[in-house]
Amino acid sequence: THKPVNLYMNTDLQNYSHKRLNILTGEWVLVSPFRANRPWQGQNEELSNGKRSAYDEGCYLCAGNTRINGEQNPKYKDVFVFTNDFAALQKESNPFISKDGLLEAHGEQGICKVICFSPDHSKSLADMQPVEIGKVVSAWQREFAELGGVEGINYVQIFENKGAVMGCSNPHPHGQIWSQSSLPNEVIKKDQHQLSYFKKNTRTILGDYIAQELVHKERVIFENHFFVVLIPFWAIWPFEAMIVPKKAQKDILELSDLEAVLFAEAIAVLTKAYDKLFNCSFPYSSGIHQAPTDGENNNHWHWHMGFYPPLLRSATVKKFMVGYEMFGSPQRDITAESAALRLKSLID
């Protein structure tokens, strides 16, 4: 057994290989800070920082344009939501269960939607004002309530893939909302760990975690009256970040009008800092993890929004999850503390 030490300002964390526990999933990430400056002769991504016009006649998501299925978009003025023309889940899917020895398959029902953040083809969330992002937040709330209320829908996943390097098929500012009958793998892990902690402590694990982070703030990059933006202690991606409400809430429907405004502010601050980091339109995948819509109490849930950006050391060098990370566990070089310092310095 090892004697516990105070992790604050522990120089071992900045100099030696170690692993860190993700309290939400129970998984570990290997941290190798001494590798941060290793030479790079690998792949460099193409930098697509060319200026885009506010309207693209060939874009399927621009206002007034016709989508691939023949439907015409309305001339929307702010946020536009529609059912995905190429949905990954089918509402009418047969809820079958098929078993053959060790082989098992279950039918999965769901509804997938696309949410256009703005009619302006050239904008990302980082380019939008908090009041504009607030309209996106309101749309997320409406869709979460509507989809979560559909019979047989037990989970609603809100997410965004930004940038071609993240597999985004259209540069128009947009995200997606997938709702389904079962809980996804990541959500199952987070549900179990949050429930276990809540049963023992009658408090949410993220509430206690945020309270601890706010003591020294070495991983906190921004906070307002209701939200904390930080690099999680267990972050996997180089500049991974998380937005967490200071008060325990199980989903975004519990946000007051003022809290929704402060959520939009937190998103604006983080995404603008990202763009300044390498002077580019910073790619990432982001998503909101919140309580299932299965009709259960779910008071152990503390919703949060994660940002997983791939860029490592420049606008053209990204982190690859390969080799050991595919067969062993995730690994990172730059520490969460170093990443937090860099991002915090970019916030006005």
Predicted regions and their residues:
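Extended C-terminal subregions enriched in glycine
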Residues: L262-S281
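Active-site microenvironments that recognize anionic phosphate/pyrophosphate groups
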Residues: V5-H172, W178-L258, T271-K272, P283-Y284, ...
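Acidic/histidine-rich, metal-coordinating catalytic segments
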Residues: S286-Q290
